Amino acid sequence: MNEAIHVQGLNKTFSHKSALIDLALSIQPGEMVALIGASGSGKSTLLRHLAGLACCDRSNGGQVQVLGREVQSSGRLNSQVRRLRADIGYIFQQFNLVNRLSVLDNVLLGCLGRMPRWRGSLALFNNEEKQRAMVALERVGLADLAAQRASTLSGGQQQRVAIARALTQRAEVILADEPIASLDPESARRVMEILADINRRDGKTVVVTLHQVDYAVRYCPRAVALKSGRIHFDGQAQDLSKQFLNDLYGADADASLMITERSQRVRQKARLTLAKV
């Protein structure tokens, strides 16, 4: 079986500053993985390279493969990357919705990667695509808001619309870049539970960048910690220690980053809740 994600020797430099350094990573189909680390550690940069939204260095840049297909190598994107992106759902921190469009129309945009360009440019969605979008909205609890303008939704609701768009896209790999960074605790919990449910029930590979370690421990079996463009930890999220996190986050480490007994209990409760769904 092909790896869902394979990264080898990935290097990225911005203005002579290394953002990713000889990075290697393998993720198996159906895994849910948290990328953690302080701001500027390379989490979002790595995620963008996985989706082919950024190119690695041309000299010794490395290689990225998703679902057994090459996304990029040595600073050059695969000429067929648009087709590959149809299998990669990308969820942005700031939602990336079209505010003037309805919730349903935003979700239907997930179909564009599998449509002829002429039909997509005219927004000619068929009944099967519309039904699929409504099923996705039902799953994230927003079917009753399908006709509402996206601009009227709360941040948590907009992020759930973005998840529904990825479901409508029928993506095999979902990449979520700080999806809960700007959300209140209840909205953050709901977004993470939806992503975990998609991973568990649908077998989708989910990679999520998180600044909040307690959410990583609660919802992601595996964690990969980055610091200064290098991987410093790759293992079970529950094995992350307070000492390691203090070293990882440095001056940014505070009570919200620490794994407490309470967060461990909440994690177990969340897993039990998901098992009953």
UniProtKB/Swiss-Prot annotation:
UniProt-listed InterPro entries: AAA+_ATPase, ABC_transporter-like_ATP-bd, ABC_transporter-like_CS, ABC_transpr_PhnC, MetN_ABC_transporter-like, P-loop_NTPase
Residues that hold ATP according to the record: 37-44
Catalytically driven reaction(s): phosphonate(out) + ATP + H2O = phosphonate(in) + ADP + phosphate + H(+)
Pfam families: ABC_tran (PF00005)
Top-rank lineage group of the source organism: Bacteria
An example Gene Ontology CC term for this record: plasma membrane
PANTHER family: AMINO ACID IMPORT ATP-BINDING PROTEIN, PHOSPHONATES IMPORT ATP-BINDING PROTEIN PHNC
Family of this protein: Belongs to the ABC transporter superfamily. Phosphonates importer (TC 3.A.1.9.1) family.
The protein's role, per its UniProt record: Part of the ABC transporter complex PhnCDE involved in phosphonates import. Responsible for energy coupling to the transport system.
Name of the protein: Phosphonates import ATP-binding protein PhnC 2
Species the sequence originates in: Pseudomonas syringae pv. syringae (strain B728a)
Native organism taxonomy: Bacteria, Pseudomonadati, Pseudomonadota, Gammaproteobacteria, Pseudomonadales
